[in-house]
């Protein structure tokens, strides 16, 4: 049986400002880096992957030191298109933003971006490879939520309920999972 460790990157300035941030390659905030330094994860022998985004690379380095790892863009966050790096307050009066929020939010595509369903399809197409051996994946909240929602549909949680706090995540073995404190 293999174990998949899903860990969300540490906080960025965009997280602190409640900005939509998916495709923008931001570093960790100073607060995010300091919070990660207080965490201690003991993970047995495993391969390491990141999404390749700066915030995931920095999180890996802080949590596990200089370990060999692979980057996989399949595990990048959703692309929010023209809404990227804006807050709800900045966007709330835009007609295209309201259209994106209305109806099936997972199917709606932000202008010049990708839908939640498109991101999920991208992530799930790469997931079987991760399940072949013990793997630590440092990635993004939406990616982790998509994986957890697909692995545990019987939990009947929505995507936002699966999304871990920065620096946190899940360890998944077969059909057993546990939150990483």
Language-model features: where?
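Domain-level recognition of soluble alpha/beta enzyme cores
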Residues: 154-180
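Phosphate-handling substructures
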Residues: 63-122
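Short active-site segment of divalent metal-dependent hydrolases/proteases
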Residues: 12, 143-144
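Generic beta-sheet signal
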Residues: 4, 46, 133-142
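Short beta-strand scaffold positions
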Residues: 50-51, 121, 138-139
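Active-site-proximal alpha-helix that buttresses catalytic centers in soluble enzyme cores
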Residues: 2-67
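Short hydrophobic/aromatic-enriched beta-strand-loop microsegments
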Residues: 27, 67-74, 155-164
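Conserved histidine-centered catalytic loops in small-molecule metabolism enzymes
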Residues: 43-74, 97-99, 151-152, 173-181
